[in-house]
Amino acid sequence: MKTLLLTLVVVVTIVCLDLGYTLKCNQHIPPFYKTCAAGKNLCYKIFMVAAPKVPVKRGCIDVCPKSSDLVKYVCCNTDRCN
């Protein structure tokens, strides 16, 4: 019985703990974040070049797009770095 209980505790711990395999990215308002889906291993934020201090959008992405004359993309790969 003790072995079964110990096994259950270990399984619940593994399921509940984030073991570092997922990335967390800020949403539009930075205190709020979401866990990225599998394959989305970058966080990003988009700025309008005319107003570089105000991010337009934030989230998870798989490949960082190239910036243009109007929009600047900033990508990173650590938790809540955007």
Curated annotation (Swiss-Prot):
Q: Which InterPro entries match?
A: Cytotoxin_Cobra, Snake_3FTx, Snake_toxin-like_sf, Snake_toxin_con_site, Toxin_cobra-type
Keywords recorded for this protein, A-Z:
Cardiotoxin, Cytolysis, Disulfide bond, Membrane, Secreted, Signal, Target cell membrane, Target membrane, Toxin
What Gene3D superfamilies does its record include? Answer: CD59
Which coarse location class describes where this protein primarily resides?
A: secreted
Q: Name one GO molecular function term.
A: toxin activity
Q: Which cysteines are joined by disulfide bonds?
A: C25-C43, C36-C60, C64-C75, C76-C81
State the signal peptide span: 1-22
Q: Name one Pfam family in it.
A: Toxin_cobra-type
Its localization reads:
Secreted; Target cell membrane
Recorded hits in SUPFAM superfamilies, A to Z, give: Snake toxin-like
Report one GO cellular component: other organism cell membrane
Q: Where expressed (tissue)?
A: Expressed by the venom gland.
The record, for CDD domains, names: TFP_snake_toxin (cd00206)
Q: Name one GO biological process term.
A: killing of cells of another organism
Task: Tell whether Membrane is among the UniProt keywords.
Answer: yes
Q: Which residues form a coiled coil?
A: none
Q: What does this protein do?
A: Shows cytolytic activity on many different cells by forming pore in lipid membranes. In vivo, increases heart rate or kills the animal by cardiac arrest. In addition, it binds to heparin with high affinity, interacts with Kv channel-interacting protein 1 (KCNIP1) in a calcium-independent manner, and binds to integrin alpha-V/beta-3 (ITGAV/ITGB3) with moderate affinity.
Q: How does it assemble?
A: Monomer in solution; Homodimer and oligomer in the presence of negatively charged lipids forming a pore with a size ranging between 20 and 30 Angstroms.
As a miscellaneous remark, the entry gives:
Is classified as a P-type cytotoxin, since a proline residue stands at position 52 (Pro-31 in standard classification).
Family indicated by similarity: Belongs to the three-finger toxin family. Short-chain subfamily. Type IA cytotoxin sub-subfamily.
Protein name (record): Cytotoxin 10
* Source organism (scientific name): Naja atra (Chinese cobra)
